[in-house]
Structure formats: C-alpha cells, structure tokens
Amino acid sequence: MPMGSLQPLATLYLLGMLVASCLGRLSWYDPDFQARLTRSNSKCQGQLEVYLKDGWHMVCSQSWGRSSKQWEDPSQASKVCQRLNCGVPLSLGPFLVTYTPQSSIICYGQLGSFSNCSHSRNDMCHSLGLTCLEPQKTTPPTTRPPPTTTPEPTAPPRLQLVAQSGGQHCAGVVEFYSGSLGGTISYEAQDKTQDLENFLCNNLQCGSFLKHLPETEAGRAQDPGEPREHQPLPIQWKIQNSSCTSLEHCFRKIKPQKSGRVLALLCSGFQPKVQSRLVGGSSICEGTVEVRQGAQWAALCDSSSARSSLRWEEVCREQQCGSVNSYRVLDAGDPTSRGLFCPHQKLSQCHELWERNSYCKKVFVTCQDPNPAGLAAGTVASIILALVLLVVLLVVCGPLAYKKLVKKFRQKKQRQWIGPTGMNQNMSFHRNHTATVRSHAENPTASHVDNEYSQPPRNSHLSAYPALEGALHRSSMQPDNSSDSDYDLHGAQRL
C-alpha cells in the first residue's frame, strides 16, 4: 500500500481516539467504567446509574433500541456486577420504581455502549434495573492445633444448597459431602432439628434458618435443559445429632434411597429479596404499598401477621425514607380487589408471595421524608408572573385612579353656589353658613335643582349680582322679612 494512502487512515484513527477520549467511558466493558445501583437497600440491586464526563446519569431502559418493558439476558451485565463486588447478575430490565433526582440518558448502539447517548426528559424515561447476587460473607477459619498424626488425605466435609430451576440463592435441597461420598439428607417432619438447621444455614453463609421448603422428593424428574450436576443426589445420609457443632458429627451414612423426603431449607440470606414501593402519595415516602412478583407489581394485602410496625419500617428503609409515621388499612369494599399476600411479619422473610383474588385490603403507609418537597418550579413561576402583572397594573392604572380620587375629594370640599331654581326666581345667593337647611320634605320641588359651581364669579366693573341688589333694594322698602327662605337677606352685602 502506498504511503500516501496511509496518511488519511492514520488521521482518521487519531481522530477516533480523540473522540473516544472526549466521551470518556464508552462501554461497561471498559476497565475504568464507573456504575452504581441506587434506590434499594443493597449495593447489588437497584436503579442503574453511570458516571460520564459531566456527572452521574440514570440509564433509561429504552436505551439501545429496547422497549421500556423488555428484559435482557443478565449475563451481559456481568462486568458491572463484578465492579460492584457482587455475584453473578440475576436480572436486567425495567426497574419500574423510577426516581430521577439527576439527569437521565438514552444510549444507542450495542448493549452496554455509552459512546452515543443523549439526555432524556425525566417523565419519558423508565429506569433500567439490575439485580446481582449478594456477595457471600466470609468468616475467618477457626484455628485448630495441628493433629498429632497425619490424617488420611481426604476432602473436608462440606455442604451445598441446590436450588430448583428458577430458584433462589440460599434456598434449596441440602447436599452433604464427606470424602468421596455425597448425597441428600433424609428428613422426617417429626424431627426436632431447629438447632441443626440454624447451624447448617450459618455454615452455608446464608444467615439463619427461616423455614422448611415444601415437600421435596429425591430423584425428581429432570427439567428439560437443566444440567445434570444441578439435580439433587440420591439420599445417602440421615440426621444423627441435631445439636452437633461440626459437620462430621451431624449425619450418618445410610443405604442409598431413590425416593423419600429430603432436607430442604430456606435461609434468611436468600436472594433476590421482595421489592416494594409506595404509590398514590404526594412523594416517594407516602402511598399504598405494592410489591413485585416477577415482572409485575401488585398491591400488598394486609395480614394478621403484620400488625406491628416492623414490616412498614422495613418498607420505609427500602424507599430510603425515615421511620414510619403512620399506616392504615384501607377498606376493601370491592369483592374483586386483588393483590399479593405475605404470611411472614417482614417482607425480607418472604421468599414467595401468595395471590389473594378477593377482598384485598390495601395498606397506606406514610414515612418521614428526608427531603420534603418545596415549591415546584411551576408554582414559583406563577407567583412571579402574578407579581409582575400586579406591578404593571399599578403603573398603568394607578396614576389615573389617583387623579380621579383626588378630583372627587376636592369637589366635595369646594364651595357650593345656589343659582335660580324656579321660573319666578331671578336671584342667586351665597348660602348663609348659619342658616339651617330645611329638609327636602318641606321643599320637594327644589331638592333636585341645586346648582354647584367650582369657582365663584370673578369681580368686574359691572355688578356680578344684579338680582341680589334688587332684593336688597326691595328689602329696604319692606323691612319685615316674613319669607320662609333660609337665606338672610338683611345680612347680604354687595360684593
């Protein structure tokens, strides 16, 4: 290939490296990729958030051309679980309880690629959820003094829980291995083995014993596609000492059996746990309790085993809220109301939920909100707009209204003038301040013809009051003032 054709290729390669370095973490397979799981009480399950160059972003489940309800093969997110120090991925799909305190993004291209992402509206984004297996808690091995004699080389006794197809971690049939011999353990319902079961769950690093699983028969039919190594072994052991403190003293070997009930336990460390949420309230810390069964959410029905607040305290903690403030049972007036039922006191003890097809009484729980909601942006904008309109209204209409009020007030204080009010009256007078105004009932014909003048007549060389001068002249000729008028004609003076 000529050297001239290599230069454009080298330029494109360098440009691609520059774009990749600007975008930062392009895929969850990159060694420096950062991710976290939020909105749950475990670091190994929750809402997937990734860190790009400008901060943390919630990943929408519609990314990479998927629908908001599509579930993916969880093994594709194994690198994310490894970076979170969790076990294998159990589920990858819509988280359903969407909480978006920060920005959300939709990405395109191959699954797990973040080189082509765009910001999405929070109300259009459904969060992507990931559930990984919880890591096993390791305990330091007990130190024992070295044996005086060299034992026969053999594997130490050990236990294993075999879950049924689609089962849970820390739940299943107990298998015991001693040396080269391994098998299941025979179990009878009348056996008093509470201490033994707690010892077994603790030895399996699965917490404490919760319950026996429903009757499980050894040698059950193999499910299609299930590997043979996941099938329970035949019965080889029987309980010997229910108070044992070491595995080699707990069981004794018996003749192999192909059928019979075997020991199957459910321990408190089972995974995945029941997920809950609060809906229909004013915030994520208030509402009706719903639980998840597979990919579906349904109302949690009230039960007699949950009369205390322990269950609701656990629900509030899962929502990352404070302690429970109150809870009340809603009346199930509809006989067709359906939901899910947990027979245990706490939801963390329920490895399966039962259906209730009628008279499901929902529970409304109110938790303490660590971040109470303030005024919404729309409310603040409305208040500001109303204040602006009020100021504009005062600026435009205020001066005009003020002038009208001042004018009206001044008119009331101005002097009132009385002019001719009848056909035979040709005089106008100043009203005497000492005269008593008669009622309108005595002079109804003049009650509506009073004249008001804003200013008195200006002085001139001509008489401004000829009628008044005539009246004065007549009054001098007729000294008796027998008129019923309210005006003092004797006291009138020429202006």
From Swiss-Prot:
Keywords: Cell membrane, Disulfide bond, Glycoprotein, Membrane, Phosphoprotein, Receptor, Repeat, Signal, Transmembrane, Transmembrane helix
Intrachain disulfide bonds: C44-C86, C60-C125, C81-C132, C107-C117, C201-C267, C244-C250, C285-C321, C301-C360, C316-C367, C342-C350
Chain ranges of the SRCR domain: 35-133, 159-268, 276-368
Membrane topology label: Single-pass type I membrane protein
GO molecular function, one term: signaling receptor activity
Maturation and modification: Phosphorylated on serine, threonine and tyrosine residues following TCR stimulation. Phosphorylated by LCK on Tyr-453 and Tyr-487 upon TCR engagement.
Modification Phosphotyrosine occurs at: Y453
Extracellular side: 25-372
GO biological process entries: apoptotic signaling pathway; cell recognition; T cell costimulation
Pfam families assigned to the protein according to its UniProt record, in alphabetical order: SRCR
Ranges of compositional bias, category Pro residues: 142-155
A Gene Ontology cellular-component term: plasma membrane
Main localization (coarse): membrane
Positions carrying Phosphoserine: S439, S460, S483, S485
Residue intervals passing through the bilayer: 373-402
Localization per Swiss-Prot or TrEMBL: Cell membrane
Signal peptide: 1-24
Region feature Disordered, mapped onto this chain: 136-155, 436-460, 473-495
Record-linked Gene3D superfamilies: SRCR-like domain
Record: glycosylation sites: N116, N241
Stated role: Lymphoid-specific receptor expressed by all T-cells and in a subset of B-cells known as B1a cells. Plays a role in the regulation of TCR and BCR signaling, thymocyte selection, T-cell effector differentiation and immune tolerance. Acts by interacting with several ligands expressed on B-cells such as CD5L or CD72 and thereby plays an important role in contact-mediated, T-dependent B-cell activation and in the maintenance of regulatory T and B-cell homeostasis.
Quaternary data: Interacts with CD72/LYB-2. Interacts with PTPN6/SHP-1. Interacts with CBL. Interacts with CD5L. Interacts with CD3Z/CD247.
The name this protein goes by in its record: T-cell surface glycoprotein CD5
Native source species: Homo sapiens (Human)
Gene name as annotated: CD5
